[in-house]
Amino acid sequence: ALENDGIKFDYFTKTDCLSPDTLQHYDAVMLYANHGRITPEQFEALNSFVQSGHGFLPIHCASACFGHEPRFVSLVGGRFKSHKTGVFKPVILTPNHPIFEGVKEYETWDETYVHSDINANNRAAHWPRPS
């Protein structure tokens, strides 16, 4: 369905895709996984990819990945600590940010993630939830 909008993607299940040879073919990496380990070479490839201006979108449980690699925690902006579930209303702290254009207030049910090691820098759209 997304291909009709010009969005194409490949799906990988192993971290060996995190190499310069593979990443050079992509504009962005979306990480929706719960991998335990990343090699130093794989992290360097991902970090270089991001630092050179490519996109990185760690979603859902991605902040639980690679717990042994503190530089990954810095790149993501925090580390998964725990979660519960519940109904909540997201609060947009920066409603004038372009990513929120057209987003209306809503209520949803989901896992309510709690993070540690929060990187407060460059969090233009960060929504801190009351504990």
Language-model-derived ranges and their functions:
Residues 1-8, 32, 49-52, 75:
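Structured segments of extracytoplasmic/periplasmic soluble domains
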Residues 1-26:
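Aromatic-Pro/Gly-enriched surface loop or interdomain linker
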Residues 9-11, 56, 124-126:
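Conserved beta-strand scaffold positions in the cores of enzyme catalytic domains, especially
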Residues 15-18, 43-44, 111-113:
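A generic local structural motif
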Residues 23-67:
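Short alpha-beta junction capping motif
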Residues 59-131:
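An acidic, glycine-rich "communication" segment
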